[in-house]
């Protein structure tokens, strides 16, 4: 059983994806940080561009106003892997977003599935 109990965190949704899903016409706060070099989070269609600075958390607000899928780019040359620094943002209407969100695992779901791993059960290591 998970030892650290946080009653307020059990319903947190755990997103494990390279894509960001957002609800249309709802303000969003983007937090950025970098552990290595300067990067830049850029979505041209949103007119949203912000540096990710090593050792600093930067942020900005925006509100998507058109549904669709948009490409996220790193707009700051950051090294040999720069060309591959891409992602996507999917902006959905309220109903589709609610459906997607309802399909995601919560922290409690994730812990329940990995209960043996959390308490150190060796059965997982034998598989």
Regions found by a protein language model. Give the residues of each.
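Non-transmembrane, membrane-proximal soluble domains of secreted or membrane proteins
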Residues: 3-127
């Amino acid at each position: 059983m998970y030892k650290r109990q946080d009653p307020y965190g059990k319903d947190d949704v755990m997103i494990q994806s390279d894509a960001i899903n957002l609800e249309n016409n709802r303000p969003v706060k983007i937090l950025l940080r970098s552990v290595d070099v300067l990067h830049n989070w850029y979505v041209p269609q949103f007119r949203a561009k912000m540096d990710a600075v090593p050792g600093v958390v930067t942020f900005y607000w925006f509100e998507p106003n058109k549904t669709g899928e948009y490409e996220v780019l790193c707009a700051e040359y950051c090294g040999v892997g720069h060309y591959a620094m891409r992602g996507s943002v999917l902006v959905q209407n309220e109903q589709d977003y609610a459906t997607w969100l309802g399909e995601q695992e919560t922290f409690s779901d994730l812990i329940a599935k990995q209960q043996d791993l959390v308490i150190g059960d060796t059965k997982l290591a034998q598989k």
